């Protein structure tokens, strides 16, 4: 088996390191960061023997793939440069920061025929994968409504340790709408296989922060899918509150799933059945349904589980490596990456126009041009 050589760009890529190290036939050989001190940390953590301050210089090395974990505004330019250089790409979220970038990214993946995968690791958490399998087996009946929330006060990241303004001040909290949607949307989209979001409408209560940023004090974005299903995503990165990493809800014709929403509350499921009739339904702890956890999660080693997010940080990079080796499309391909990201980008226009409905373009290959434009109802 040929060894796949990986280059890591940016300190955020350290979250993938333990997962990559747990995969046979994978070697992290290169690291890149503009900050020399950060570069030393990355090299030490990864064991990379080659270090670079310039991204294009790393692309001239013999790496096969690159993990792009730089600031958001760098993702698409660096992904396109890597694809053009013949490298496979795994990119941190979000896929891009403008709608034009998303179209350019899709075109580049199609042109250079290399693997591109979005590193939306929340979609790989065990509870999400368990419910996804239960949906596949029909235990929830037909899913028709879902919720996803990402509630994380990030105002401590507005400045770098040296006091300088960070990139997040502009590209995250300097924008309106559900600017960072993939942790909310990506996992629940797995409950609606073969579907995609086609229109959105975003609302906010306004801005109630003392930091002078444009980001709304929480947004709610209603998403309608191609098959008529409804998804409600909530994003709040400025309000004072404990970090609630994620909250998900799924409603189907035969049952419901809901993650814990606070201290002492756990993930739970309620399914219609002989012992759970309409009018008398009760919750069961998700641990009662562990038989539906995918086999690879059941058999995960300590090393794989320790990669983070209950093994999710291992399995997402495993899928990326497998996609490179087989040539098959990865689970979170460029089209999903761009569609999920577009929800956030267009929500900014929607919320600024009193919740105006925005159509999500169809990024899929060979779609007619009229399907790839931003439509205003």
Residue ranges and their predicted role:
Residues 63-65, 71-72, 76-124, 138:
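Beta-strand-loop-alpha-helix segment that lines the small-molecule cofactor/substrate pocket
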Residues 157, 179-277, 284, 305-306, ...:
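Contiguous beta-strand/loop segments that form the cofactor/metal-binding neighborhood of enzyme cores
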């Amino acid at each position: 088996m040929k060894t796949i050589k990986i280059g890591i760009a940016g300190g955020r890529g350290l979250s993938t390191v333990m997962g990559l190290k747990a995969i046979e036939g994978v070697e992290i050989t290169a690291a890149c960061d503009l900050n020399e001190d950060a570069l030393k940390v990355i090299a030490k953590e990864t064991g990379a023997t080659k270090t670079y301050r310039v991204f294009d210089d790393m692309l001239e090395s013999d790496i096969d793939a690159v993990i792009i974990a730089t600031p958001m505004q760098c993702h698409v330019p660096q992904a396109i440069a890597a694809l053009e250089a013949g490298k496979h790409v795994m990119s941190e979220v979000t896929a891009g920061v403008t709608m034009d970038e998303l179209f350019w990214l899709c075109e580049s993946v199609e042109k250079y025929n290399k693997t591109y995968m979005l590193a939306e690791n929340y979609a790989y958490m065990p509870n999400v994968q368990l419910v996804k399998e239960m949906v596949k087996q029909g235990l929830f009946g037909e899913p028709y409504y879902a919720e996803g929330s990402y509630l994380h006060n990030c105002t401590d990241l507005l400045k770098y340790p040296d006091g300088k303004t960070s990139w997040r001040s502009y590209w995250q909290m300097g924008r309106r709408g559900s600017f960072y949607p993939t942790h909310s949307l990506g996992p629940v989209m797995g409950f609606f296989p073969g579907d995609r979001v086609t229109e959105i409408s975003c609302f906010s209560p306004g801005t109630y922060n003392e930091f002078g940023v444009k980001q709304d004090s929480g947004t709610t974005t209603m998403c309608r899918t191609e098959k008529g299903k409804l998804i409600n995503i909530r994003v709040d990165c400025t309000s004072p509150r404990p970090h609630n990493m994620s909250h998900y809800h799924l409603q189907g014709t035969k049952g419901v799933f809901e993650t814990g929403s606070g201290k002492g509350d756990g993930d739970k499921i309620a399914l219609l059945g002989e012992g759970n009739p309409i009018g008398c339904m009760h919750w069961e702890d998700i641990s009662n349904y562990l038989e539906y956890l995918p086999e690879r999660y059941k058999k995960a080693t300590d090393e794989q589980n320790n990669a983070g997010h209950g093994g999710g940080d291992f399995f997402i990079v495993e899928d990326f490596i497998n996609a490179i080796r087989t040539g098959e499309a990865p689970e979170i391909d460029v089209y999903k990456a761009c569609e999920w990201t577009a929800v956030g980008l267009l929500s900014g226009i929607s919320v600024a126009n009193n919740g105006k409905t925005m159509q999500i373009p169809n990024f899929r290959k060979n779609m007619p041009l009229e399907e790839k434009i931003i439509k205003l109802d």
